[in-house]
Amino acid sequence: MKILIFGLPGSGKSTLAEPFADLIGGVWINADQVRSHYDDWDFTPEGRMRQALRMRYLADGVVLSGKIAVADFVCPTEQARQEFAPDYTVWMDTIKEGRYEDTNKMFEQPPHCDYHVSQWFDNTHEQLVEVVRHYMQRQADEKPDQVMVGKMHV
């Protein structure tokens, strides 16, 4: 399973993603760490699509290894989100503007998300575990031949 936690810079993506990934036995993939590793700080539309693809490949590798991938990155456009191809999306809608004007201008509100965080609570990551668990249970009921991975066995 590939989970995308996205939103404007400063919205709490990493603050949610790291403890959430730990709680579910998943692998946290942080966009800033990935950009640093590849020394790619290009935030043009092309650079952002390259980052979405890079994040997708890393997350797909995690899933192929039998774990849940939890990726957090801005992913500002619907095209970038589709390129990443998540199984589950979490929109961190906790701020109206981030610290980068170019990102604010290009950020597209999603037409759909699986979980919408509009206010941060100290236990948001724990609440998300239960929501994802129910989602995975519904998926298992619809497709009983699929195997759940990580700590998220249902």
Where in the sequence are the language-model features?
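Glycine-rich phosphate-binding loop used to anchor ATP phosphates in small-molecule kinases
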Residues: P45-Y100
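Short, structured coil segments at secondary-structure junctions
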Residues: I24, A85-D87, H112
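The conserved Walker
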Residues: L8-P9
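Small-molecule kinase domains that catalyze NTP-dependent phosphoryl transfer to phosphate-bearing small molecules
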Residues: Q82-E83, M92-V154
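Conserved substrate/cofactor phosphate-moiety recognition/catalytic segment
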Residues: A17-L58
